[in-house]
A protein has these predicted regions:
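Generic short N-terminal amphipathic or hydrophobic helices
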Residues: 4, 127-130, 150
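C-terminal catalytic and target-recognition region of SAM-dependent MTase-like enzymes
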Residues: 4-42, 185-186, 190-231
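Short coil/turn segments at beta-strand junctions that form active-site/ligand-binding loops
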Residues: 13, 81-83, 104, 147-150, ...
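Short, flexible, glycine/charge-rich loop motifs used to bind or transfer phosphoryl groups or to couple energy/partner
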Residues: 36, 96, 141-143, 182-184
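SAM cofactor-binding core of SAM-dependent methyltransferases
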Residues: 56-140
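S-adenosylmethionine
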Residues: 145-214, 218
Length: 231
């Protein structure tokens, strides 16, 4: 039973190493073919890292996420073209690039220097002008940008593939439990928080410990889900 599983069993420990930019990778597994062709036309190269191989939202997953968010907003009579969205864990740009095609503006935040440079490169390679990027921990700058958007998306690290070894999985950002991070966003008056998580996220623990009243769960066939959490 879940009550007999300790936090240590639920949350893997992984030693962090900096990402490495890779060459000679088949980018069609990760980016939309049209985006790859556009980067070639622009005489620039999309880039990916070793961590990006498993952490990026591949273009079809990114599209699925965007579609779910747009459906949610339209049900609330909100036009996504009038909306700015924050991507708090932008990585190398999988979700941010897709969001830029449907939202007015994307505020993309990345904490890692190498991924920030790859993110900047990929945005430039596609000649995207409605993404504003920040090199920062989103918790440190949310106060300065929250007036630009009350929709916050994030995809915290899953610890590589080791999440698959757990029946129930607890996400963390640094030392903070994911419910604590979500409650910080609530306290910052973020109206809509969207979380990408592995399929085995410990939902009961999460829901019982967040301040938001509502949560919609969407599952896809790629071992992941998104949670739309709101007032």
């Amino acid at each position: 039973m879940l009550s007999n599983i300790s936090d240590e069993e639920l949350t893997p420990i992984k030693i962090y190493t900096d990402p490495i930019i890779l060459n000679n990778i088949n980018l069609e597994k990760f980016f939309d073919k049209k985006d790859i062709e556009l980067s070639i036309i622009n005489k620039k190269n999309l880039k990916i890292t070793d961590k990006g191989l498993y952490s990026i939202s591949k273009y079809y997953d990114a599209q699925w996420i965007t579609d779910r968010v747009i459906d949610f907003l339209k049900n609330k009579n909100i036009d996504p073209l009038d909306v700015n969205i924050i991507d708090g864990t932008a990585g190398i740009g999988g979700n941010s690039i897709n969001f830029s095609k449907y939202f007015s503006k994307v505020l993309s935040i990345e904490i890692n220097n190498i991924h920030y440079e790859v993110l900047k490169n990929n945005i430039d390679a596609l000649n995207i002008h409605n993404i504003q990027i920040y090199l920062a921990n989103f918790l440190n700058i949310i106060d300065s940008i929250k007036d630009d958007s009350n929709i916050f998306f994030f995809d915290p690290p899953w610890g590589g593939n080791c999440y698959k070894n757990f029946k129930y999985f607890n996400l963390k950002i640094g030392k903070l439990e994911i419910n604590d991070v979500i409650n910080i966003l609530y306290d910052k008056n973020i109206k809509y928080t969207i979380l990408k998580a592995p399929h085995n996220l410990n939902l009961s623990t999460l829901y019982s410990n967040i301040k938001y009243e509502n949560m919609i769960v969407h599952r896809n066939i790629k071992q992941s889900m998104i949670l739309i959490i709101f007032y």
